[in-house]
C-alpha cells in the first residue's frame, strides 16, 4: 500500500530525529538548525496541506493533541520518546501563563508572530510565589499536582523571538511565555525524551488553579484549526512575495 504524502513527510522527520537522538541526549543548536531547515513557511504549507488530505494521519495526530492550559493548541506530530510538536496560539485566545520548567530540553522555531519569554531563577530576595510540584500521568494514575509551599523567584531576563528565530531551552530552566493574544503565534518545537522526576509549576496570580487535565481536541476541531493556520501561512507567503 502506497504511503500518503503526509506519511512520507512524517516518516522522513522520524528517521532523521531517530538518528539525532541516538547520538544526542538533549536538544542543542544543531536540532534548532534542523527545525529551521525543514519547517520554512513553504515547507509548513506543504505539510499542513498533506495532513489535511490524509484522514488517517489526521486522526492519529488528533489522538495526541489537545488545548494546553497555557493557552495554545498542542499538535503532536511525532511521539517517539522525543516529541515533534506544533504549538498555535490563535489571536484573541485567552491563556494562563505560569512559570514552569520541564524534565526535558527542547529546541523551538518561531513560525508565525512573535513570542516573548521570561526566564526566571530562584533567588532569596525575589518575589514570593506559591509553588506546585506536577506529577505526569502514568499507566497506574492520572496526572496530579501537590502544593510545595512558597518560593522566592527573580526575573532573570526577557527574550523576544520573531519569525525565523530559533532557540534552545535547557531542562530545569524556569520560564514562561508572554502572549497578549493580539496576533496568531506558532512554533515548531522538538523536545528531548522525558527524564524521570517532577515539574515545577508556579502560577503568576493568586487563585489560578493550573489545568493539569486539558481537554483533547477532536478531529474536526483539529482540522479546522490547522486549516486556519494554513490560511495564515499562505497570507504570510503572499506578503513575503509582494
Regions found by a protein language model. Name each.
Residues 61-65, 74, 94-100, 176-177:
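Catalytic micro-motifs at enzyme active sites that drive phosphoryl/nucleotidyl and oxygen chemistry
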Residues 121-171:
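Short acidic-glycine-tyrosine-enriched beta hairpin
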Residues 103-117, 121, 190:
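Short, conserved beta-strand element in jelly-roll/cupin
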Residues 2-84:
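A short, N-terminal "cap"/entry segment at the start of jelly-roll beta-barrel domains
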Residues 86-100, 119, 171:
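Conserved short histidine dyad/triad with adjacent acidic residue
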Residues 107, 183-199:
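A short hydrophobic beta-strand segment most commonly corresponding to one strand
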Residues 203-242:
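Extended, charged low-complexity segments
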Residues 117-118, 175-180:
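Short beta-strand His + acidic residue motifs that chelate non-heme Fe in jelly-roll/DSBH
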Amino acid at each position: 500500500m502506497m504511503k500518503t504524502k503526509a506519511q512520507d513527510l512524517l516518516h522522513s522527520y522520524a528517521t532523521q530525529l531517530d538518528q539525532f537522538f541516538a547520538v544526542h541526549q538533549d536538544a542543542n543548536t544543531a536540532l534548532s538548525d534542523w527545525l529551521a531547515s525543514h519547517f520554512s513557511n513553504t515547507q509548513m504549507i506543504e505539510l499542513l496541506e498533506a495532513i489535511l488530505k490524509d484522514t488517517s494521519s489526521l486522526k492519529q495526530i488528533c489522538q495526541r493533541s489537545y488545548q494546553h492550559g497555557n493557552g495554545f493548541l498542542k499538535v503532536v506530530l511525532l511521539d517517539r520518546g522525543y516529541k515533534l510538536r506544533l504549538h498555535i496560539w490563535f489571536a484573541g485566545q485567552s491563556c494562563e501563563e505560569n512559570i514552569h520548567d520541564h524534565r526535558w530540553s527542547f529546541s523551538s522555531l518561531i513560525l508565525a508572530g512573535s513570542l516573548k519569554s521570561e526566564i526566571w531563577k530562584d533567588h532569596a530576595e525575589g518575589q514570593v510565589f506559591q509553588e506546585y510540584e506536577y506529577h505526569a500521568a502514568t499507566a497506574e494514575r492520572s496526572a496530579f499536582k501537590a502544593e510545595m509551599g512558597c518560593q522566592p523567584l527573580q526575573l532573570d531576563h526577557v527574550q523576544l523571538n520573531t519569525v525565523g528565530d530559533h532557540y534552545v531551552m535547557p531542562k530545569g530552566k524556569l520560564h514562561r511565555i508572554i502572549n497578549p493574544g493580539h496576533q496568531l503565534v506558532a512554533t515548531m518545537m522538538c523536545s528531548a525524551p522525558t527524564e524521570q522526576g517532577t515539574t515545577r509549576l508556579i502560577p503568576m496570580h493568586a487563585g489560578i488553579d493550573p489545568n493539569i487535565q486539558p481537554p483533547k481536541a477532536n478531529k474536526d476541531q483539529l482540522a479546522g484549526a490547522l486549516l486556519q493556520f494554513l490560511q495564515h501561512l499562505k497570507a504570510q507567503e503572499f506578503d513575503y512575495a509582494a
